[in-house]
């Protein structure tokens, strides 16, 4: 079982991270940097509202809470689109901070009474939710125009020459896809249940595609040749006027959290849509991996005939193994984490950039919704809002405590404000 002290520590780390992202004046927190994102003050109060809902109101939105019902509903993400939230009568930042602090104090009292045999899933859900919103707030801050509010990030390890453009073989055969509550008690519903699948051999990129490799695609006219693009992708490329990854400037620089800088050739490319990733792969004579292929390359140990908890083994993520936590503000150069390689030799599979896969979001066989029933189910393929592609592996902005090889993210194929990149795959 997960110790109460561990849950308390993870709650504290998430809150510390959140508060660092809202250390700005009230006017700044109420700004909407882009219609795709919420004002930061909405995210802040929403974090507290969801914590209260799941830990103090038993997940029942009709159960009275600390906020008046009409205020509580302002923070329902399904009721109010991101574009509309700037026009809502939101709590002032001081009230939002006070609300979050009060909820947290009561939540910790509840944690103290948690039975010893309770794995604390509701607390883990709240921790994951807050950390995911911290990444969302970083996306918003990256879209902000004007003088920088954040620094350029902590130093990162150097990369290794010769790894870009290389691949590793993943032999075919059965493996265990997904996890169960016994092995990963804090896994989310779409990661479960564990089940055996058998897939053919394939090759997968040792590291993600780099900025330098993407520059070759641009220089070769990749954005101007419809033969590399799917019909939907080409239509979007034309409609949106895509000519390079988001935040790349015509003079060869990029804008990152308001800082103008040269584009490092050895960093994984980020801020590309699924359609761009798909086109690049076609141009490179490759394809995108399926999410099942991706998970096997990341987590399966063919010698042990079992899953690894992380690509490198059982050790918890650290600065020597992966770029996580958000303090770097960017991906690490490829080859920076040889100790973090998977059993097959694939590197940087956790952290740095979310990697587009070719897979739509589907439930695993035997899927059962968790207590937060709307977490996954409304987004599955075939639902009214089910136009999504799965991304795997996390990014530099993801908290290390919530990331697993089985973690499944998803977004619309046109989105690229997210910290998204590409890893290639090939048939064998």
From Swiss-Prot:
Domain of life (superkingdom): Bacteria
Cofactor field: Fe(2+)
Alphabetical list of Gene3D superfamilies matching this protein: dinb family like domain, paralog of FGE (formylglycine-generating enzyme)
Keyword Metal-binding among UniProt keywords: yes
Biological processes, Gene Ontology terms: ergothioneine biosynthesis from histidine via gamma-glutamyl-hercynylcysteine sulfoxide
Reactions catalysed: gamma-L-glutamyl-L-cysteine + hercynine + O2 = gamma-L-glutamyl-hercynylcysteine S-oxide + H2O
Stored SUPFAM superfamilies: C-type lectin-like (SSF56436), DinB/YfiT-like putative metalloenzymes (SSF109854)
EC number(s) stated in the UniProt entry for this protein: 1.14.99.50
Binding site for Fe cation: 46, 129, 133
Keyword Protein biosynthesis: no
Pathway: Amino-acid biosynthesis; ergothioneine biosynthesis
Pfam families for this protein: DinB_2 (PF12867), FGE-sulfatase (PF03781)
Keyword annotations: Iron, Metal-binding, Monooxygenase, Oxidoreductase
Positions with a binding annotation for gamma-L-glutamyl-L-cysteine: 82-85, 411, 415
PANTHER family named in the record: HERCYNINE OXYGENASE, SULFATASE MODIFYING FACTOR 1, 2
Family assignment from sequence similarity: Belongs to the EgtB family.
Assembly: Monomer.
Function as written in the Swiss-Prot or TrEMBL entry: Catalyzes the oxidative sulfurization of hercynine (N-alpha,N-alpha,N-alpha-trimethyl-L-histidine) into hercynyl-gamma-L-glutamyl-L-cysteine sulfoxide, a step in the biosynthesis pathway of ergothioneine. Cannot use the alternative thiols cysteine, N-acetylcysteine, or glutathione instead of gamma-glutamylcysteine as substrates, and histidine is a poor sulfur acceptor substrate compared to hercynine.
Record protein name field: Hercynine oxygenase
Naturally occurring in which organism (per UniProt): Mycolicibacterium smegmatis (strain ATCC 700084 / mc(2)155) (Mycobacterium smegmatis)
Lineage: Bacteria, Bacillati, Actinomycetota, Actinomycetes, Mycobacteriales
